[in-house]
Amino acid sequence: MLRRVAELPWPLRYLLIAIIAIIVLCILCWVDKADESRVELHVRASHPLGIRLAPSLARWYRVDVPASQVDDALAAMRRDPFVDEAFVAPVVSLPSVDDGDACPITTPAYDHLQGYLAPAPDGIDAAAAWRRGDRGGGVWFADVEGGWNARHEDLPGDRISLVHGSPVDAPGWREHGTAVLGEVVGIANGRGVTGIAPDVERVVTASIGSSTSAAAIAEAARQLRAGDVLLVELQGLGPLGRFMPVEYWDDNFDAIAAATARGVVVIEAAGNGGENLDRALYRGKLDRKKRDSGAIVVGAGAPPRTGFSDRARLDFSNYGTRVDVQGWGRRVATLDYGDLQRCDDDTRERHYTDEFSGTSSASPIVAGAAILLESLAQRTLSPVQVRAVLAAAGSPQTGNTREHIGPRPDLAEALSAIERSAMRSR
């Protein structure tokens, strides 16, 4: 029979192949149900005598079959002498890089990525405080910036309250604020990240949305008590068009100074302008000998084992005598953004990152250290005392120390210094 088919003119042969394909399709589909899912098969016709044919799309057929009959359809077609190849059509997609890992059913622990918690000199040695049985209990914490996602699975939403302004309706602000809170108060539950001070009693947020930064700082401070900690996660463009710490502007300076005068410990980002804050251009506004807001100003230092010199100033960080201490300015694991874990929904409640950076990532580390110091001290420490202890008891800056950003806090040494001071005062 095959020989007879081969003797047919070529147009008739291809017509016969097409008819056979149609018959096979009809046989496969006669029991089809309207609501059954479909699968597309790709079938290539062959020469019945095995003669090699030139590649041509004219030899390809598309067969749509019910999903339940895929295996039988493939087997039947592959046995057919007129079929050279048959396979399930692949599902094609854009050749883009996935923005994050697949979302697991349960978020795993990411604390092994939080090197900033590690013993000094790599981190601030948060465990030195935790071993004393305290993780920030009794202290209130405020964060001043633009927005947050208090519904994130790793935040204590029942302890977070907005006291001023309207959150800025922009993903960048929400991601930033959520990442900041994760570093400080991320829940210690064996999943996701663990905040430096997860047992903080109350978390206050104050937004610059529909407000000024000075008003937001003032209202956040008004909600706090002596010994509580306020973090200012803001920067502004200075006279050279570079980012500056917000106390450069007099209204912000006054709001911060009023807060520290009441005993509130204020942590302030140095800013990402790569600028020398001791320049004469700034007219001594960032010279503590001329005026001192009482805030702890935080620069961005390089983390260990990342291709940079550990504890050296990162090039974007502002520097100068006004900068007191440093925190990790790169590779910080915390909440949101989604480059570490991304879940496909609009809530972003299970997003995590290990790439948070800038003086934005450095400042919450110091804020967490300050909370633990206040929580464990036998008496309320003044803002100036907290600043002095953190600056004196730390792992020293490396690299070009003339571009001063100060040491990385060492809580083990800082707590020992406080205990020694308490014993001397008895």
Language-model features, listed with the residues they occupy:
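Autoinhibitory N-terminal propeptides
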Residues: M1-L53, R78, F82-D99, D125
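Substrate-binding/access-modulating region of protease and related hydrolase catalytic domains
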Residues: V5, R131, R135-G137, T205-S293, ...
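Protease zymogen maturation seam
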Residues: G50, A54-A58, R78-W140, E153-D154
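Catalytic-core environment of secreted peptidases
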Residues: V144, E153-L155, I160, T306-S360
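Hydrolase catalytic cores
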Residues: T205-S207, G329-G406
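C-terminal subdomain of the subtilisin-like protease fold in secreted/lumenal serine endopeptidases
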Residues: Q223-E233, A295-V297, S375-R426
